[in-house]
Structures are given as structure tokens and as C-alpha cells.
């Protein structure tokens, strides 16, 4: 069921956050969220030719490295973003931990992408936009 929802979400473009377009960040928070999203998409790409049983382990290995870098950047550039990112990571890992082994990857991707979309919308709404 989760795999079917994820497939539909990917086709409809829901598995990527609004920051996927790139180039429109106006705050440090937005830039960091774009970096997190890019790392997330890159880690997803590493699973393209991996058997389903190994997707989560492959994804997690790639994503862990970039996640640590992104959190370190957030601490130094936008410390107010750290608790939000922690919540995103914790929700996604919790979903994966409670999923059946064959559904761990899909559960993580679904929860992470939706949580990232929510926090990506927050700074975008509150950012000061330059006058036209």
C-alpha cells in the first residue's frame, strides 16, 4: 500500500519539496532546506538499480553522510532550523522503524518528503521578498 502511494506521489510530483526548483532561496533557512532536499534526492538516486530488499540500507548509507553535513551547516548558519530538521529526521526514521522490512524505504521517503515540504513552506511564507 505504501509503495503504491509513493509511486503515485512520485508521478504527481509530491515526493519532492517546493525547493526542488532551486535558485529561489532568499534566506539562510531556505538555502539550507534546498541543500537538504538536494541531498535527499541524491540519496534516493543511489537506489535506482538496487534490489528492493536493499533499497533502505543503500539509501540510509548515502543519506547519513549528507545529513550530518547538512545539520552541521544548519548549526552554524541557521540554528533556529535545527529543531525543525531534527523533527523531520526523527519522524522519517520512526516511520521506517515501524514499517515492514520491505516497506522501510518507501515509509522513510514518504514521511521525510512530506515533513520537509511543511518546514520548507514556513520560511518561504515568512521570508522578506524584495520589491519588484
Swiss-Prot record:
InterPro entries: Poa_pIX/Phl_pVI, Pollen_allergen/Os. SUPFAM superfamilies: Group V grass pollen allergen. Residues 1-22 form the signal peptide. The keyword Coiled coil does not apply. It comes from the Eukaryota. Transmembrane segments: none annotated. Keywords: Allergen, Signal. Belongs to the Poa p IX/Phl p VI allergen family. This is Pollen allergen Phl p 6. It comes from Phleum pratense.
Amino acid at each position: 500500500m505504501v509503495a503504491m502511494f509513493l509511486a503515485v506521489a512520485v508521478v504527481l510530483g509530491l515526493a519532492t519539496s517546493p525547493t526542488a526548483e532551486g535558485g529561489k532561496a532568499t534566506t539562510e533557512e531556505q538555502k539550507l532546506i534546498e541543500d537538504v532536499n538536494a541531498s535527499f534526492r541524491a540519496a534516493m538516486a543511489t537506489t535506482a538499480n538496487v534490489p528492493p530488499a536493499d533499497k533502505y540500507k543503500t539509501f540510509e548509507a548515502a543519506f547519513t553522510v549528507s545529513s550530518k553535513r547538512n545539520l552541521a551547516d544548519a548549526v552554524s548558519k541557521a540554528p533556529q532550523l535545527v529543531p525543525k530538521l531534527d523533527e523531520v529526521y526523527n519522524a522519517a526514521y520512526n516511520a521506517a522503524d515501524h514499517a515492514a522490512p520491505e516497506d522501510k524505504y518507501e515509509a522513510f521517503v514518504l514521511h521525510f518528503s512530506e515533513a520537509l515540504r511543511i518546514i520548507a513552506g514556513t520560511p518561504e511564507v515568512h521570508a522578506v521578498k524584495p520589491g519588484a
